[in-house]
Every structure is written in structure tokens, then in C-alpha cells.
Curated annotation (Swiss-Prot):
Keywords: Cell cycle, Cell division, Mitosis. GO terms for biological process: cell division. The lineage of its organism: Eukaryota, Fungi, Dikarya, Ascomycota, Taphrinomycotina. This is Mitosis-specific protein spo12. It comes from the Eukaryota. The keyword Glycoprotein does not apply. The keyword Cell cycle applies. It holds the Pfam family Spo12. Has a role in controlling mitotic cell cycle progression at the G2/M transition phase. One of its GO terms (cellular component) is nucleus. To yeast SPO12.
């Protein structure tokens, strides 16, 4: 009988079901995030100081604008160049 009890214990331990991992966590996560989303009107808030610029920022903007104005125009692709040459010939 001891062997049958040991066999039954071994079989019962093998037959134990393994619970699957929780797959619902993704849907729960989405539900939680949806509750915490900002309202759309809150994203369009403008501060009264948005139009103000510090002297340092103004200087940096002027410096950047100066270099952007001096830059070379972008190189046109070969197809655009050929089209412009053909239109000039006509």
C-alpha cells in the first residue's frame, strides 16, 4: 500500500495544474492610463509670459537667425535640376 500511496502522491503532484500568467494586466494598465489622461482643453493653455523673451534667449535667437540666413540653399536633386534646365530651354 505504501507504493500505491507514493504513486498516487507522485501522480497528484504531476497532475497539478499550473495557473497561467495574468494576461489581463495590459487591459487593466490601459484602463488606468485612460483615467489619468489630461483633458484636451488643458493642453492648449498659454501662459502670459510665453511671448516674453529673456535677453539671453533673444541673443541666441538672433545668432541662430544670422547663421540660418547665411546658409547655402539646399542642393537640388538631379531630377529637379534637369527639369529646371529643360524648362529654361523651352
Amino acid at each position: 500500500m505504501s507504493e500505491t500511496q507514493a504513486d498516487s502522491i507522485a501522480k497528484s503532484s504531476v497532475e497539478t495544474t499550473i495557473q497561467p500568467l495574468h494576461q489581463e494586466s495590459a487591459t487593466l494598465r490601459q484602463q488606468v492610463l485612460q483615467k489619468h489622461e489630461l483633458p484636451k482643453h488643458a493642453l492648449n493653455v498659454a501662459s502670459p509670459t510665453d511671448s516674453l523673451m529673456s535677453p539671453c534667449t533673444a541673443k541666441l535667437q538672433a545668432h541662430k537667425k544670422k547663421y540660418y540666413m547665411k546658409r547655402k540653399p539646399p542642393v537640388m536633386s538631379l531630377q529637379n535640376t534637369l527639369q529646371s534646365v529643360q524648362t529654361e530651354k523651352e
